Amino acid sequence: MRKIFLLMFLLLISAVHSASATEVASPNGTLKVTFNLDNTVPTYAVTFRGKPVIKPSRLGFALVKGGDLLDGFTLVGEEKGSADETWTPVWGENRTIRNHYNEMLVRLEQKSTQRMLNIRFRVYDDGVGFRYEFPQEGKLNYFVVKDERTEFAMAGDHTAWWIPGDYDTQEYEYTQSRLSQVRQLMKGAITDNMSQTTFSPTGVQTSLMMKTADGLYINLHEAALVDYPAMNLNLDDREMVFTSWLTPDATGAKAYLHTPFRSPWRTVMVTDDARRVLASNLILNLNDPCKYADTSWIRPVKYVGVWWEMISGKGDWAYTQQYPSVILGETDYTKAKPSGRHSANNANVRKYIDFAAEHGFDQVLVEGWNIGWEDWAGNMKEKVFDFQTPYPDFDIKALNEYAHSKNVRLMMHHETSSSVMNYERYMDRAYQLMNLYGYNAVKSGYVGDIIPRGEHHYGQVMVNHYLEAVKRAADYKIMVNAHEAVRPTGLCRTYPNLIGNESARGTEYQAFGGSKPGHTAILPFTRLQGGPMDYTPGIFEMDCANGSHVNSTICGQLALYVTMYSPLQMAADFPENYLRYPDAFQFIKDVAVDWDRSLYLEAEPMAYITAARKAKGTDNWFVGCVSGNAPHKSQLSLSFLDKGRKYEATIYTDAPDADYRSNPKAYRIERRTVTSSTKLSLTAVAGGGYAISIVPKR
């Protein structure tokens, strides 16, 4: 009798569990998400072709007041649906993007409080997105999130490419290791930055790239980050379970919310082909469509600028070294002794304008044009810039008129020194000044600790600020390239005037001691998953004035214009360095910044990437390959070309004796006729690459 009772009890428990379990599969059936209530606790699991990717993982929230949203739930409703549509981005890697998914919405009620929580899952052929939705039902109105408790229980001790979890910077080099090794390697992975706040010996940032022992590629990230803090991941390295770790505010709280509210999407990309990670549109598809009726003023940009002069030690942002401190409206620069190192001066900027006009560039970025740079960094100074007053040697009116006469624009620069309240105070006046003089793009910066003091770069307050700056810029038809801001999560679909972000370790670090060769072969798998990066490639002179060395070859730099997608591309080096190598510089002049079609031909994280892209509105193709710490040999098929048509290919390759450390400027250029049946044998040296332009023959 006792055995019969036990059997009946187990059958009852099984029935309860099966009644609360529901699942949804991808359109092609390879990915499956299962939702369940495990003893009233919401959980989900993900499989790929029957293999576990995410083991049963808990979902929910700890709240500051009113009781948590972690357990005590019943399933009170379920909806399923699907969508298959095609949309056209304002700019992008492809002319059109397919948005094809199956969807499941589960409606939960916490019986003890009668509070409702919905969870929506969208399953694509290459990944999963899910988010929390808080309906306006009367029992939960205003609430404060103490912690989000979303778990990602991994099915093994995977290889991962990671950077330390941090509330203030992503400007780290990537470490490749097993998940179980993160703890022991964390200390060495943390390098100094002007603003950084790490939080755990096993905390890492998204986008997190992983590879399983049997060849699955898994990427964890988020999409549509709005009115919510950015998510890091904290690893339980015994169980191999990641838990979401939100960026706190100055009080330690994570998010102040009110219903109705939708969280950002949590994303799990899964594929058995690394190339599909790079080609995925999962993050973009999970964002809302474009909010603007008129986007005619948003255009991709290829630009040059004085920036590398300051970064590499040739010049300064500041006009004078006379003043140890500056008071806006009181410091008299007309009485200051110029240092002679100020790069943003009339003669120098005219030189860059002339260079841009002669070589077909759209804009010239001028940093250091405005007063206040003498004490701008590291002082937690609130009133640091006014974004309106130029230095005495920068004639803003005359220089813009000169640029426009040559069909070139100047690009504005708004470094905030992270004094956010100050920037918001001047923002409209700064944008109005841009309209007055014909600027249509601004590079903003957030160097240093955030003011209001105690806030972090990736907290809810700052996430809202970055988006407000983009939306307000749109009122003035201005495009934004935000540096040191929160890492992108696909919002460029919704707000396409956000044409660039830094939000990672860019080329500037090549002048601060250098980055490892594999860095540019991992960024497209990680940082670029959320949106394009203003990486600022194109350095030809690898030995910087400050003694640092750029760990790349010239051909490796050329390849970045194809492998590192962005509608905003800079030729970052000095004009005179390009004029020394005019044949190699020709590729930078020719390469497009907007595309009809993009293909990833070869890829392995941190090892190599080969991409081919068709320039928008033309039949011209461009190919780029970057290599990591080891050489990479390609047997490159040109089968993507139109059949029956002949093309002229200009092939830029590392010379056999090229070496990123000792002989980085050794390259070869070959021209040959190619067709869709052509196969090319090409080699990129370690830290190098190759680039090809392919144009139809007339």
Predicted regions located by residue number:
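An acidic-aromatic substrate-binding cleft motif
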Residues: 258-351, 359, 363
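Catalytic cores of secreted or luminal carbohydrate-active enzymes
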Residues: 555-602
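Aromatic- and carboxylate-enriched substrate-binding clefts and catalytic-loop regions
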Residues: 367-553
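Catalytic domains of carbohydrate-active enzymes, especially glycoside hydrolases
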Residues: 348-369, 436-440
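C-terminal beta-strand-rich structural cap/linker in extracellular carbohydrate-active enzymes
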Residues: 671-698
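N-terminal accessory beta-strand-rich subdomains and adjacent acidic, glycine-rich linkers
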Residues: 23-293
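Bacterial N-terminal signal peptides
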Residues: 6-15
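Carbohydrate-binding surface patches
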Residues: 605-647, 690-693
